Amino acid sequence: MFTKVLVANRGEIALRVIRACKELGLETVAVYSEADRECLHVRFADDDVCIGRPPSRESYLNIPRIIAAAEITGADAIHPGYGFLAENAEFAEIVGASNITFIGPTPQQIRQMGDKASARKIAQKLKVPTVPGSPGPVESLEDALKTAEKIGFPVIIKAAAGGGGKGMRVATDPEMFAQAFNLARQEALAAFGSDQVYLEKYLARPRHIEIQIMGDTHGKVMHLCERDCSVQRRHQKLIEEAPSPAVDQTLREDIGEAAVKLAEEIGYVGAGTIEFLLDEDGSFYFMEMNTRIQVEHPVTEMCTNFDLVKEQIRVAAGEPLSFVMNGHRLRGHAIECRVNAEDPARNFQPSPGLITAYHPPGGPGVRVDTHIYAGYTVPPYYDSLLAKVIVHGNHRQEALARMRQALDSFIIEGVTTTIPFLGRVLHHPDFLAGTVDTKFLEREPHLLKEPT
């Protein structure tokens, strides 16, 4: 086991990793930008190092400074959290070359699954269903249009190196295809440094279902069932739950088996998430793999009683998986709401500033993962996530009642938050019935504004 872990992140996930390390008896190192000097992860770590100015590229994305911080403090492992450098194969490579353990998969695994076209080829080789699309990146507009006509409109054009909804454009007919294709390539180049794109059939009302997996260095891979992340805005998840209201035990076993097969094929080590689209007819299609811990991992923890972050650290240290589970031990129902410093009525415009009052919800089955406090200033430089409210109940109705109560009693003043908006979603008949899909908010834009 390690002795000291550097957490190459900030905010709630940095605190989450520090907590897991402390439970395992490990010392921790926080790195922070000048804007995050007053952050709680800095206060709770055993050591802390300022790694630069507020912009991410000068701090949380600055690989040499993070490695230097690890060497100065004697850290023998680095946990990347999510976002920033978590899925950067070059970072994982440099960490290893510096004789420090990267808590996550190998650089090769990050590359294999981080490139969507490569991941799709692996899925097809294993006969895991994929959405009909181009076999790899399309090189020219002419080739792309031929492929689109073969697949059948509507199609979605996606960045090969992408994620987070960037570099994605939908074309409903040949007339609008050229414009969508060129825009997707421009966005892909700006966001990811590569203008390669591929095409897929566009599904009208799919659900977003993902499988949590964990692999060890002894060749064992387990899955911990599904999460439903269908409530999204521009491919950004807002509410997640487990289990999915749309997945029965037979489908759960089929999707879980497909996810494990993919992870086993590359000898995957650590926590990962394999994302699928579930069509209205019950067909599921592999979409992509995230080679890191996810923001929404707590809903799985609440339903399985496993600490996924502690397990990540253990398997990175070479220990075998501490549990045996493949889809059979879900306990009750969990829901997570992401509370952001954003104004839904103004196109989710960020709302940085001073938090003047803060009171989190509590009670049985309620968990709040957060880094904020009264007097904390939300900086304008980073993701606007303030807190994750996670509830667990014996069944979905109990979990829903707990979440509504939790949001009603959650006080954050000084900045605009998404709490009222989340409350409106939780009262919507489609959400109550468990029938939402990824286009739900596009059809219900009135939910973004306070009723007059």
What role is predicted for each listed range?
Residues 7-26, 48-50, 71-73, 89, ...:
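ATP-dependent carboxylate activation and anion-phosphoryl transfer catalytic cores
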